Regions:
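Sec/Tat signal peptide C-region and signal peptidase I cleavage site
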Residues: 19-25
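A short aromatic-anchored loop/beta-hairpin motif
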Residues: 27-96, 100-105, 197, 201, ...
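Extracellular and analogous surface-interaction loops
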Residues: 91-95, 100-110, 119, 154-156, ...
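Beta-sandwich interaction modules
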Residues: 103-104, 133-161, 167-173
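Short, surface-exposed beta-strand/strand-loop-strand elements in extracellular ectodomains
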Residues: 120-136
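Catalytic nucleophile loop of clan PA
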Residues: 249-260, 400-423
Length: 483
């Protein structure tokens, strides 16, 4: 039995078609790089060339990853040491400001995204990243993106040649000098991700791209989603470790305090772990990636993203699909306070099986889909029809299916509209009647009696010991918790 983490590979769908306009990634201020406004076009510095990649080797590794139940991969991590001190070019501007630019080329890449081991911007400084032809821009990133551990990640730029541009106004430099404070920017890149899966849809290519999920999948905008409009807004596509993707969902808690908690699958974590390695500040989360049409399938918006988080709880054995395969993450950037139209899904830790259920997910990195099971779920161990009820078994989908990339997505009780689990894996696909298994939120509540709060969900989803369930809310900040 394999997890929903590979088979019909491709990340292409993740960020859709390339538009000839500025786009933003993570929480950012938008706008355009400083150099774009200069009267005379200034040449970018010569690019730092990345080594070539071995596609055959990567595809062989991808097959092994599938067997191991890892999340699907779209890019190859290239280790580097590029920063504002050892790379790029600084120049002083006529107004006294400063500009730093670094050019990176990964020949043949479908996209490039970056991971940072030290990222800090002073107030007033702004960073943009753009394709060398200036057709795709992300940013601007500011001090609002600084993290306590100074780890950061930026989203995909659809080109094999990108430019980083950091602008520091004269007043920022003057303030630093006047206060005698060494508040210098630090932009240190430790990984360049060479995207080797197609991103733009080309019907003549055999490699799948946008619209790559099976034809039986149903867009959430279709009538099947009419009773689930709120819950649909809770589901998010995530980039784990900068080079793989899964699905997750924003979840409410009994304190109803707008805390940005996200549930996904443990096997999506890679080496991250609540105890030994809790930071996932290299992760990126894409909200509201949904088709505006039922049919034909149309790409959705890709500009609502946040980055970073901390693993609060998982069952241990990083990357394992067994136990109940849960992972709870606290997001570093709250999509609600960023102004995104999101929903905090309700949950239910009951061990009583729902009589019917609905799943919402991003199959093969595609726009959001909805799947329906009209029969009762059963509590079983993973991959079985009986055993310790660590999982909910979906016998076969009556509408839609799940695929690689759907891992970590929620399954909701039709009766209560509360989430009851997160997808681990299974054999379901268009054209078959094979089962799927979702990690049970009820089992994960105590995780078989785990003593450490980092190995169970109840300490975080019910911090006051109030209840084992809560309804969803678009704005739980203003809701009075149950007595």
């Amino acid at each position: 039995m394999t997890s929903k983490s590979l088979t019909h590979l491709v990340f292409g769908v993740l960020f859709g078609c390339l538009f000839l306009q500025t786009a933003m990634a993570q929480i950012s201020i938008g706008g355009k790089p400083y150099s774009f406004a200069l009267r005379t076009h200034t040449m970018s510095p010569p690019p730092v060339l990345m080594p070539g990649i071995n596609i055959g080797k990567l595809e062989a590794e991808d097959l092994l990853d599938e067997q191991a139940g890892l999340a699907p991969r779209f890019g190859d991590l290239i280790e580097v040491s590029l920063n504002t001190n050892n790379s790029g070019v600084w120049e002083t501007l006529p107004d006294g400001g400063r500009l730093w630019r670094l050019s990176i080329m990964a020949a043949g890449a479908k996209s490039i995204n970056l991971l940072y081991d030290d990222f800090y911007l002073p107030d007033g400084g702004v960073l943009y990243i753009y394709s060398a032809d200036r057709k795709h821009v992300i940013g601007g990133f500011t001090s609002a993106n600084n993290k306590a551990d100074r780890i950061f990640a930026t989203g995909l730029v659809y080109s094999d040649h990108i430019v980083l541009e950091y602008y520091e106004p004269a007043e920022v430099i003057a303030k630093r000098a006047a206060n005698n404070v060494a508040e210098e920017a630090s932009i240190s890149i430790n990984y360049v991700v060479h995207g080797y899966r197609f991103i733009e849809f080309n019907p003549n290519d055999l490699v799948k791209a946008f619209g790559s999920s099976g034809s039986c999948n149903v867009n959430t905008i279709c009538s099947q989603g009419d009773n689930w409009r709120d819950q649909i807004k809770s589901v998010v596509m995530l980039l784990s470790g900068g080079s793989r993707f899964c699905t997750g969902y924003l979840v409410n808690n009994t304190a109803q305090d707008c805390r940005p908690l996200l549930l996904t699958a443990n096997h999506c974590l890679g080496t991250a772990d609540a105890i030994s390695s809790p930071s996932v500040n290299t992760w990126t989360f894409m909200w509201r990636y949904e088709s505006p049409n039922c049919t034909p399938n149309t790409d959705g918006p890709t500009n609502m993203t946040t980055s970073g988080g901390t693993v609060l709880a998982n069952p241990g054995s990083p990357g394992s699909i067994f136990s109940s395969d849960f992972a709870l993450i606290e997001l570093a950037e709250n999509p609600k306070t960023a102004g995104y139209d999101v929903y905090f899904a309700g949950f239910d830790a009951t061990t009583t099986a729902p009589s019917s259920a609905t799943g919402i997910h991003h199959p093969s990195g595609d726009v959001k889909k909805i799947s329906m099971e009209n029969a009762a779920l059963t509590g079983t161990s993973y991959g079985n029809t009986s055993g310790t009820a660590t999982h909910w078994r979906v016998a076969d989908w009556d509408s839609g299916t799940t695929e690689p990339g759907s891992s970590g997505s929620p399954i909701f009780s039709d009766a209560t509209k509360r989430a009851m689990g997160f997808l681990s894996g299974g054999g379901a696909a268009c054209g078959n009647d094979l089962p799927d298994w979702y990690g049970s939120l009820g089992y994960s509540w105590t995780n078989g009696g785990a003593s450490d709060s980092r190995r169970r969900l109840n300490a975080h989803l019910d911090p006051g010991g109030l209840a084992t369930f809560v309804d969803g809310s678009a704005n739980p900040c203003n809701v009075t918790p149950p007595a």
